[in-house]
Regions:
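Long, basic N-terminal domains or extensions that often function
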Residues: 1-234
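Conserved phosphate/anionic-ligand binding catalytic regions in large, soluble enzymes, centered on
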Residues: 29-31, 124-143, 330-353, 435-455, ...
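Extended amphipathic alpha-helical scaffolds
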Residues: 1-47, 51, 232-371, 556-570, ...
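Glycine-rich, flexible beta-strand/loop modules in the N-terminal catalytic cores of phosphate-handling
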Residues: 27-112, 117-119, 124, 190, ...
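Mobile "lid/hinge" segments at catalytic clefts and subdomain interfaces of large enzymes
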Residues: 142-262, 450-549
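Long, charged amphipathic helices and adjacent flexible linkers at domain junctions
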Residues: 229-240, 534-561, 607-629
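Flexible, glycine/charged-enriched surface loops at secondary-structure junctions
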Residues: 105-111, 146-148, 215-233, 265, ...
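Single-stranded RNA-binding regions, centering on S1/OB-family and related RNA-binding modules
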Residues: 292, 556-558, 565-698
């Protein structure tokens, strides 16, 4: 087999790209990547012809987690991999975001980047290998691509940065940062952080950028040796002469007047009127009619960008640092455990919080063997009515999963520990109305919903998005605080930052250009800090200033007790008989951890206390003189057996039943009687002995 491989040392491990001419040879580009013992097969494939009737670049990125990579057989009936996991979807999105801007904007051929994880070394994260491998496979292919780009991950433990941390370090650190770069600029940022100060975050971003330059040089070397010549393609750009004719029919001033409104629906109606006018004018030109939608979009885009860049004039009339009108309210939904509504302009999110015992946390069956469950879940829904459209609901797509994960990541650093608050927590963000930055509105609504539910979060968290419009030079740019949908569509950047008053908890940066300069990155982070502090002070804190001291009226209550781990079996009983008996009698839920922590969850305080007392009785060493209440469960000639807790029985000898002599147990007791007994210790056979006559009967 003709085999060629190239290597580079990245931190502690060797990154190797195997370029086998007899592997994946029908793909346009293929790289078999190794980093330590982590192995990922990365391919880039493009269709031969452009797809007809579309006005976008059809890029698909797949990250496939094979369970054999960690020596597992998949669960489920079929015992094979099914739909992509949440982690696989999020990784696909992280790979997509830096690569998409580097493809030609007028390219309409379908492109698929496949990344198949074939083995996992816990010291070398497969997501990172897939990111770099996808870039290599695309760069060496004949697919038009203005690369290379490279990615690096940064963690932080005890204030020290760790480049490309292991799985364990990634989980334990205060920072999870992924940065993609081109030769000169940063093109993608994704971060979760434990209230990292802005200056520290910027330092980490540019440490990753430095490492990326080494990887880019490595990719350049690979392309020089095995890269293919990029193929020619049919441009789908709107002809310049069509634009000139459009301007004669609809002047730039008319277009500016159409888009200059703070109401999204009014603007859309204005554009429909313009489109109808142009459709009538071009009725004889079928070629132009076929691309009229794209042409109007481009005309509107140029108009908006000129307004912002040259005149500092936003479509809704705001100043470049101004946030849309804000409103917040809690307890808007009855009977739920917690709820909140957050509104920013024409973006509105209702969030509902639900609390449950830890047994209901999400189980995870993935490649990371250290991650088996998730206690906090945030789910984001985006129905079609929120943007005035009609579309059937097909369940959450990649966008919904990505937005949900971002708001989830934003709040994890401020959640109480399991010991402080032994609940599984789910928040659901329902998008009532959307005109940009719903993920940041979801973060604000989720935070208030948690506080309303009585979750003792450490600090309030808010989020905001910063946009960008660039000119011909790096110094010619305008940053926009709180972008609406139009500024997101026609702008160059969506820079989302969440955090507390102390620092950043999450970042997600999407761009449509070939990277950002350092002044833009620093300016966006500073702008987002000012905005989130303003949102907290003027909107969120007036609605709810601190977490409630108790969980909601309809939320389950939890009481806990620590028992000797050796007594767990006593509580569970044979085949679960004892614990199921406690649950059946009291209606509570019981969770037991391996270290002996027993959590009792319910809504009836009396029944919870009863279950707790049962657990205490079962796990306590019996002492002479202890008094119990129990039920007669068996009668013998020599005495009666009393069940004083599920699975626990003691015997009252016939001589200990009454103060006077009795001939038959049945003369005093019948099955099912509830009696009070005092413990006499254990008899010669190790059984618990009780007396009824030495304690008052009720």
């Amino acid at each position: 087999m003709d085999r060629r491989n190239l290597c580079i040392k990245v931190t502690r491990w060797i990154l190797q790209a195997d370029l086998w001419w007899l592997i994946g040879k029908q793909a346009n580009g293929c790289a078999f990547m190794h980093y330590g013992d982590t192995t990922v097969l990365c391919t880039a494939t493009a269709s031969e012809k452009p797809r007809d009737g579309i006005d976008f670049f059809p890029l698909s990125v797949e990250y496939e987690e094979k369970m054999y990579a960690v020596g597992k057989i998949p669960g489920g009936f079929n015992k094979r991999e099914g739909k992509a996991s949440e982690n696989a979807i999020l990784t696909s999105r992280v790979i997509d975001r830096p690569m998409r801007p580097l493809f030609p904007k007028d390219y309409r051929n379908d492109v698929t980047l496949n990344n198949m994880v074939m083995s996992v070394d816990p010291e070398c994260r497969p997501e990172l290998v897939a990111m770099i491998g996808a870039a290599i496979a695309t760069c060496i292919s004949d697919i038009p691509f203005d690369g290379p780009c490279a990615m690096t991950q940064v963690g932080m433990i005890d204030g020290e940065f760790i480049i490309n941390p292991s799985q364990e370090q990634w989980k334990k650190g205060d920072l999870n940062l992924t940065v993609a770069s081109t030769r000169e600029k940063v093109i993608m940022i994704e971060a979760g952080a434990n209230e990292i100060p802005e200056a520290t975050m910027i330092e980490a971003i540019y440490k990753a950028h430095e490492v990326n330059q080494t990887i880019i040089a490595f990719i350049d070397k690979i392309v020089a040796e095995v890269g293919k010549k990029k193929h020619e393609y049919t441009s789908c750009a709107v002809p310049a002469e069509m634009f000139e004719e459009m301007k004669k029919i609809v002047s730039p001033a008319e277009m500016e007047e159409a888009v200059f409104t703070d109401d999204k629906q009014t603007r859309e109606e204005n554009i429909r009127v313009i489109t109808d006018k142009l459709t009538e004018a071009f009725a004889e030109n079928e070629e132009w009619l076929a691309i009229l939608g794209e042409a109007v979009y481009q005309y509107e885009k140029k108009t908006v960008r000129k307004m912002i860049l040259k005149d500092h004039k936003r479509p809704d009339g705001r100043a470049i640092t101004q946030i849309r009108p804000l409103a917040a309210e809690v307890d808007i939904i009855p009977r739920v455990h917690g709820s909140a509504m957050f509104t920013r302009g024409q973006t509105q999110i209702c969030n509902v919080c639900t609390l449950a015992p830890l047994s209901e946390q999400q189980k995870i069956d993935g490649l990371d063997e250290n991650e088996v469950s998730k206690r906090y879940m945030h789910h984001y829904n985006f129905p079609s009515y929120s943007v005035g459209e009609t579309k059937p609901s097909r369940g959450p797509g990649r966008r919904e999963i990505g937005h949900g994960a971002l708001a989830e990541r934003a709040l994890i650093p401020v959640l109480p520990s399991e010991d402080e608050f032994p609940y599984a927590i789910r928040t659901v963000s329902e998008t009532f109305e959307s005109n940009g930055s719903t993920s940041m509105a979801s973060t604000c609504a989720s935070c208030m919903s948690l506080m309303a539910a009585g979750v003792p979060i450490k600090k309030m968290v808010a989020g905001i998005s910063c946009g960008l419009v660039t000119g011909e030079t790096d110094d010619d740019f305008v940053l926009l605080t709180d972008i609406q949908g139009l500024e997101d569509f026609f702008g160059d950047m969506d820079f989302k930052v969440t955090g507390t008053t102390e620092g950043i908890t999450a970042i997600q940066m999407d761009i449509k250009i070939h990277g950002l300069t350092r002044p833009i990155v620093e300016g966006a982070i500073a702008r987002c800090r000012d905005a989130r502090l303003f949102i907290m002070d003027t909107c969120m804190k007036p609605a709810i200033s601190a977490s409630r001291t108790e969980v909601g009226k309809y939320a389950p209550k939890i009481i806990s007790i620590q028992i000797d781990p050796d007594r767990i079996g006593d509580v569970v009983g044979q085949r679960g008989k004892t614990i199921n008996e406690i649950i059946a009698r009291t209606g509570v839920k019981i969770d037991i951890t391996d270290d002996g922590k027993v959590s009792i969850c319910g809504t009836d305080k009396e029944m919870m206390d009863k279950a707790l007392e049962m657990v205490k009785i079962i796990t306590t060493d019996f002492e002479e003189g202890q008094i119990f209440k129990g039920k007669v469960v068996s009668i013998k000639e020599f005495g009666a057996f009393i069940e004083f807790a599920p699975g626990k029985e003691g015997m009252v000898h016939i001589s200990k039943i009454a103060k006077e002599r009795i001939n038959r147990v049945e003369d005093v007791l019948t099955l099912g009687d509830v009696v009070t007994v005092v413990c006499l210790g254990k008899d010669k056979m190790g059984r618990i002995s009780f007396s009824m006559k030495d304690v008052a009967q009720q």
